[in-house]
Design a protein with these regions (language model features):
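CoA-thioester-processing core
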Residues: 1-54, 67, 82, 86
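C-terminal long alpha-helix characteristic of the crotonase
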Residues: 14-19, 27, 61, 70-111
């Protein structure tokens, strides 16, 4: 729900094996807000976004990977170590190059 909406704003999304992700707001009589309706279609495409938003369906980590919702599925026991190692790898790169790389899709998102 809200956790996935927050994750949609991130440059990289990983899931622990066994994780379940979704935007079940419609089942609660609520609108998912801009994160769900604006960011989700950019991440998974409009057809998958409509499916997830209109049904409130929850997907497991493997399906999230297949949909492009996450870029990696990591065993739960190793999750923290793996994401911290990735953070260290990114932090060790050139900051300006990293910043410019994350801005690669900004013109597309503002149209």
């Amino acid at each position: 729900g809200a956790g996935l909406c927050l994750a949609l704003a991130c440059d990289i999304r990983y899931a622990a094996s066994g994780a379940r992700l979704g935007v079940p707001f419609v089942k609660l009589g609520m609108h998912s807000g801009m994160a769900g309706t604006w960011l989700l279609p950019d991440v998974v495409g409009p057809a998958h976004a409509r499916d997830l938003l209109l049904t409130g369906r929850i997907v497991d980590a493997d399906e999230a990977l297949r949909l492009g919702l996450v870029s990696r599925v990591i065993e739960a026991e190793a999750f923290l170590d793996e994401v911290l190692a990735t953070a260290r790898d990114i932090a060790a790169t050139a900051p300006i190059a990293s910043r410019l790389t994350t801005a690669i899709n900004e013109p597309c998102q503002s149209s």
